[in-house]
């Protein structure tokens, strides 16, 4: 593009500005008035200026009235008009009459009126300059000539692409000028400004400088490229991270505000943030994703102050121009808030947000609106899952956390987790140990788990975990260091519940490899039993489906999913919607660390807001598993006592366990792995009574054994006492320390023989059925009992527990008081007895002492039939008082009446 064409465009813009009323142009009347010389004629300079303006004809106002001498194309000089020649003659002679001045003025205004009418006719024609064409915006989805057509191929822009049209010439000239500007940078500006005819040859200077016009052309060209790039996509997703606000305006009487933010597009609400109470520098820290169909439509951001029961106060607003964003790149934006009239100011504050605009295809658009449409397919997967996996997080503990300003521990420490749009806040703890478990849903777009350490309202540190690097269907123990502060957090993380068919956990895509099965069996052979002692075995669980589940929803259906737990490892299936007979068809694998562990299988119903309802539970010890057998298991209730609700609910499983016996034996002699998440026990009347009865049964068994031995001493059955007497003598004469385990082994052998003879192979299962019947009977009896009877039963059990605890406490205190001279006489007696025991045990073997003690017990009935059977040690301790008795034996010091009056101020006032 030549420079003369550029200056012609500038003159055209200047002429349009001159034709507007109120502008500072010579045509509108801002030209300084004609000054008459002392001789009664205009000055020479004013005459030349007036002649230059009058020499322009109406046709010359179309664009070419200023010429650059350096231009290669010089326009021919125009002939001066008659008025101009007369003015020139007047200026040369210096004499003019008053009539000549009036004629010249009259001709000037006629010419001005002619040019004004020509300008108005051009405005009606609607001809636009290149700058107007660049500033014109088009509707986003208006042109769809073809799928591969660009913006200039659309019918709306044919006027700029036809080679012979004036608009096409202007469009090409503007594009060429932009290329020159981009190539030479600021050198072009200097050349135009340095031209001798700029501002000195009669051309009035434009309102905008050349630098500003060049920047405007560059900005328009960049905007045009971005718009062309945006038009290549039909759908977008905008990720908005609302971080914080600063220096917001105070709307309440206390000098604070309760701000929240609304995001709107075309009057439609996209998102509403939570309210931060009493804060002018709020930290929302919220992330959400919204669909964008028209990126040329700005997003309106409004901030309000929440008022309970009243209308919320407006605090400021701002606009988001999505065309300024780079696709796929996260950008931090500071939004300066302005009032409703559009006047901004530092007093209204600003909002800090992070934006990422992702382009999406037509298929993604259809899939998005199909998921969100209420009239989508109404099959059994009506509530189709849009998440890909479930992330189960167990917050265990933290260490080396920062200290408070005074050097003490933080007393209100908690963690906040965020995965996409979902968030979780843990409980506050000052012990740095939480043991909380929760689930978050994993989406394909965002797989970064954000962790933040808070103490009250203060943020101390953050950490980000990339979930894409972790193996699915496996539990991982993680120690994650925190950023911006010292400390680490311990997590147990599991990614399960995958819905894709191509995952390894899907039975339809699973093909059993005989070579892998053989390698798995060889890993736990006897020859390799000492290689890795912690790897006890391998468990494979195939979950096919369930039937007869209870209806948890209003429509008589449920949304069941299955959770499998082995120790602290936790996996789960996907959710099957609107069914009572789900088919999960999943396969899971567990690393067995202890063969004595149990596999817990629980079926839940999924509700909104991550809430679940219990449908059934099953517990299977690993030692009872029959490998490779596909069978149905009955689901039980929460207490694992009776059948769960529903139509005989069952679950179909196939379990396979491979383990090493030597490793299992070594592991059984080590501490058992503690399960981190356990259900918190609450006080229940029935549970309390049941536990007391269990303890009572054990105590009664011990008492029965003691009575059996005492009956042998009392010769209630001569045959039984004779056998016991002979057995005691033989054991004392020939017995040794190995006799103790031999006796225990004989007890086990006796129980095994009883089980073998009676043929009972599964006593636990038989007990479950009886327990179910007893439990049903207990429920019926409980319903018939009155409140008085229930309270009386609780009172009796509580009294028994109270007396037992009191007896044990008294016995322990008496033993302690024996050694601390609470009763000196009894303590010295204990000293004498202990000295005698030392001498006897030193000179007499233990077996002879036991033999003598047995003879005394067996002969008491024969030699001393009237004596009362007793225990000498308990008889001695019963003579020693406990702490309560010592307090009761203590004497009070005698006191005078004056002391009593002084100690009782009420009596003193009454007497006075």
Swiss-Prot record:
GO terms for biological process: regulation of neuronal synaptic plasticity; regulation of neurotransmitter secretion; synaptic vesicle exocytosis. Residues 218-337, 371-493, 522-637 form the C2 domain. InterPro entries: C2_dom (IPR000008), C2_domain_sf (IPR035892), MCTP_C (IPR013583). Binds Ca(2+) via the C2 domains in absence of phospholipids. Ca(2+) 1 binds at residues 252, 258, 305, 307. Ca(2+) 3 binds at residues 553, 559, 605, 607. The keyword Transmembrane applies. Its cofactor is Ca(2+). It is a multi-pass membrane protein. Residues 1-33 have a biased composition (Low complexity). The chain crosses the membrane at residues 729-749, 826-846. Ca(2+) 2 binds at residues 252, 305, 307, 313. Disruption phenotype: Mutant flies exhibit impaired homeostatic modulation of presynaptic neurotransmitter release and altered baseline neurotransmitter release transmission. Pfam families: C2 (PF00168), PRT_C (PF08372). The keyword Cell inner membrane does not apply. GO terms for molecular function: calcium ion binding. Residues 38-49 have a biased composition (Polar residues). Calcium sensor which is essential for the stabilization of normal baseline neurotransmitter release and for the induction and long-term maintenance of presynaptic homeostatic plasticity. This is Multiple C2 and transmembrane domain-containing protein. It comes from Drosophila melanogaster (Fruit fly).
């Amino acid at each position: 593009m030549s420079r003369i064409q550029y200056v012609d465009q500038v003159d055209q813009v200047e002429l349009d500005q001159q034709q507007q009323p109120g502008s500072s142009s010579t045509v509108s009347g801002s030209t300084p008035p004609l000054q008459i010389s002392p001789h009664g004629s205009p000055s020479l300079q004013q005459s030349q200026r007036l002649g230059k303006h009058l020499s322009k004809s109406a046709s010359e106002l179309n664009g070419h009235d200023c010429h650059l001498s350096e231009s290669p194309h010089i326009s021919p000089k125009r002939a001066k008009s008659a008025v101009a020649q007369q003015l020139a003659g007047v200026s040369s002679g210096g004499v003019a009459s008053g009539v000549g001045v009036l004629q010249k003025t009259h001709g000037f205004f006629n010419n001005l009126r002619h040019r004004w009418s020509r300008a108005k006719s051009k405005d009606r024609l609607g001809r636009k300059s290149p700058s107007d064409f660049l500033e014109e915006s088009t509707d986003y989805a208006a042109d769809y000539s073809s799928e591969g057509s660009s913006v200039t191929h659309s019918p709306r822009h044919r006027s700029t692409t036809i080679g012979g049209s004036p608009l096409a010439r202007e469009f090409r000239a503007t594009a060429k000028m932009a290329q020159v500007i981009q190539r030479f940078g600021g050198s072009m500006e200097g050349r135009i400004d340095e031209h001798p005819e700029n501002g000195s040859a009669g051309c009035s200077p434009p309102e905008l400088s050349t630098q500003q016009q060049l920047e405007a052309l560059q900005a328009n060209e960049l905007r045009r490229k971005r718009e062309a790039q945006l038009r290549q996509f039909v759908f977008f997703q905008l990720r908005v991270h609302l971080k914080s606000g600063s220096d917001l305006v105070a709307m309440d009487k206390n000098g604070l505000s309760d701000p929240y933010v609304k995001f709107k597009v075309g009057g439609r609400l996209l998102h509403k943030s939570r309210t931060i109470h009493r804060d002018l520098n709020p930290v929302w820290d919220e992330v959400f994703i919204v669909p964008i169909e028209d990126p040329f439509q700005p997003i309106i951001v409004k901030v309000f102050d929440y008022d309970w029961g009243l209308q919320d106060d407006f605090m400021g607003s701002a606009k988001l121009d999505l065309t300024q964003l780079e696709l796929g790149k996260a950008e931090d934006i500071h939004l300066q808030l302005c009032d409703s009239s559009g006047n901004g100011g530092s007093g209204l504050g600003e909002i800090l947000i992070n934006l990422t605009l992702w382009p999406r295809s037509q298929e993604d658009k259809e899939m998005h609106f199909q998921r969100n449409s209420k009239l989508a397919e109404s099959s059994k997967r009506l509530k189709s899952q849009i998440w890909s996996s479930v992330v189960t997080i167990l917050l265990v503990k933290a260490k080396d956390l920062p200290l408070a300003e005074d050097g003490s521990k933080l007393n209100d420490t908690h963690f906040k987790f965020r995965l996409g749009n979902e968030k979780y806040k843990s409980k506050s703890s000052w012990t740095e140990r939480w043991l909380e478990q929760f689930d978050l849903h994993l989406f394909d777009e965002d797989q970064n788990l954000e962790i933040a350490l808070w103490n009250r309202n203060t943020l101390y540190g953050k950490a980000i975990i990339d979930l894409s690097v972790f193996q699915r269907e496996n539990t991982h123990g993680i120690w994650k260091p925190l950023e911006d502060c010292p400390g680490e957090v311990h997590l147990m993380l599991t990614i399960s519940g995958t819905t894709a068919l191509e995952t390894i956990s899907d039975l339809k895509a699973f093909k059993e490899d005989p070579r892998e099965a053989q390698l798995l069996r060889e890993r736990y052979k006897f020859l390799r039993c000492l290689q890795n002692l912690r790897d006890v075995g391998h468990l494979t669980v195939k979950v096919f489906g369930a039937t007869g589940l209870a209806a948890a929803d209003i429509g008589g259906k449920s949304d069941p999913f299955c959770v499998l737990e082995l120790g602290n490892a936790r996996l789960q299936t996907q959710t099957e919607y609107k069914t009572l007979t789900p088919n999960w068809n999943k396969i899971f694998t567990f690393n067995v660390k202890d063969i004595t562990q149990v596999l817990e299988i629980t079926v839940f119903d999924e509700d909104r807001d991550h809430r679940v309802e219990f449908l059934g539970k099953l517990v299977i010890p690993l030692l009872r598993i029959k490998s490779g057998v596909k069978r149905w298991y009955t689901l039980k209730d929460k207490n694992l006592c009776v059948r769960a609700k529903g139509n005989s609910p069952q679950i179909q499983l196939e379990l396979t366990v491979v383990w090493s016996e030597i490793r299992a034996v070594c592991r059984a002699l080590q501490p058992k792995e503690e399960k981190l998440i356990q259900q918190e026990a609450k006080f229940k009347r029935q549970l309390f009574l049941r536990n007391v009865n269990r303890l009572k049964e054990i105590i009664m068994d011990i008492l029965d054994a003691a009575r059996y031995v005492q009956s042998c001493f009392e010769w209630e059955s001569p045959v039984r006492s004779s056998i016991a007497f002979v057995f005691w003598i033989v054991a004392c004469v020939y017995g040794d320390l190995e006799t103790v385990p031999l006796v225990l082994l004989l007890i086990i052998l006796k129980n095994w023989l009883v089980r073998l003879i009676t043929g009972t192979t599964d006593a636990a299962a038989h007990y479950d059925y009886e327990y179910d019947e007893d439990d049903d009977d207990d429920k019926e009896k409980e319903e018939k009992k009155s409140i008085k009877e229930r309270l009386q039963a609780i009172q009796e059990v509580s009294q028994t527990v109270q007396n037992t605890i009191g007896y044990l406490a008294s016995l322990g205190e008496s033993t302690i008081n024996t050694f601390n001279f609470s009763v000196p006489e009894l303590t010295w007696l204990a000293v004498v007895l202990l000295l005698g025991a030392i001498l006897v045990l030193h000179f007499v073997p233990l077996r002879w002492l036991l033999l003598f003690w047995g003879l005394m017990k067996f002969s008491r009935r024969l030699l001393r039939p009237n004596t009362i059977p007793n225990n000498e040690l308990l008889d001695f301790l019963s003579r020693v008082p406990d702490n309560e008795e010592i307090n009761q034996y203590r004497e009070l010091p005698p006191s005078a009446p004056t002391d009593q009056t002084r100690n009782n101020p009420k009596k003193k006032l009454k007497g006075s």
